[in-house]
Amino acid sequence: MKSVGNLSPNTSLLFICDIQSKFENHIFKFNDVVGQSKYMIKICNELKVPIIFTEQYPKGLGHTVEDLLKERNENNQTKIFEKTLYSMCTNEVLNHLKQNHKDLKSILITGIETHVCVLQSTLDFLENGYDVHILSDAVSSNNNNDRLIALERMRQSGAFITTTETITFQLTKDAKHKSFKNIVPLSQERREYLLANPSLSSLSKL
């Protein structure tokens, strides 16, 4: 049976793709990508969903923005991989997944650029048998047109195009979830921020 994209914290992992300082002035709604990714990191820390950061040629392009790195939690598994391949699905990453996350089924992706590294990562992870969920409000490109076309391209290949809040409630499933009281304020804070900054909501538009 074809996967319908259900999620469980025990079989999911969040990838933060190349959100590096040198890209700040070259990516459409870069700050929105950072903000939504930061929210997702907090959610994953609360639910103990492991997190992998990738960095594209950090020697020349700098490291992941500090605003995201400071959200790393010693109580949750976090790993950083450097790469030159556009795809995050490097041999090093695949070996890490096979050795340390044997029950992994669902890969969640935020980051940049949607039509390059995010797209190629998605295709490679799909070919390796994983479900891939693209958080559309947390990915971007140099321009929105490339982003939109890439989202449709990934959908055609079998990825699930979704949002950070949708993922949040898919992972928790029940208002009786033990982390519900901690997650609700994070979700409310996100909603209030978007209401106060309506221009930032454009990444939610497909």
Swiss-Prot record:
Q: Check the record and name the Gene3D superfamilies matching this protein.
A: Isochorismatase-like
Superkingdom, according to UniProt?
Eukaryota
Name a Pfam family for this protein. Answer: Isochorismatase
Family as reported in the entry's similarity comment: Belongs to the isochorismatase family.
Kindly provide the name given to this protein in its UniProt entry: Isochorismatase family protein 1A
